[in-house]
Amino acid sequence: MKILVLTGSPREHGNSNTLADHFIRGAEESGHEAARFDAALRNVHPCTACNSCGMNGPCVFDDDFNFIREHIISADLAAFVTPMYYFGISARLKAVIDRFYAINGSIRTPKQAVLMMTYADISKRKESPILTHYDVLPEYLGWTDAVRIIAPGVWAEGSISRTEFPKKAYLLGRALSRQGASSQ
């Protein structure tokens, strides 16, 4: 299975990146091919809605999104891994998702989607802005929302290491079948 992991944290050893690391390790140990794109560390220009791409052509910006283009088109599973920033996904990951517009026709094919998110609060209510946004994304693209790992109560860098969430991410990666994700 080809997997594209899109991360949004600028902290190399941040909590959501820890989830991504464990997920990728589990997936690769199970024989899957995983490509990773750390949006916060790459140059992806925000979409300006110029419509030059026409939802299927090249984007006017020649930047690191070109790496994603081929990987997302060929991926069987896309994993979105983000910290919550002011009740939403990180701006850098959002910029990547907005640029999906330029390849809209090419990525509206059957795929699996996984969400892994971290946030400092412990209130379930605080999750809802990200979950509402995420719910619509795979639905619109015709993808299957396979599994979610929601990790509340982690704020300080590395605090997730004292929880069960890294193990859950690893086991999710290990449990991937050739057909897709299976619930944990």
Roles of regions detected by a PLM:
Residues 8, 39, 117-120, 151:
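Cofactor-binding loop segments of dinucleotide-utilizing enzymes, especially the Rossmann-like FAD-
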Residues 125-128, 158-163:
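Short, solvent-exposed loop/turn segments at secondary-structure boundaries
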Residues 1-82, 87-103, 163-184:
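N-terminal beta1-alpha1-beta2 submodule of the flavodoxin-like/Rossmannoid cofactor-binding fold
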Residues 134-152, 160, 170, 175-179:
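A charged, well-structured terminal subsegment
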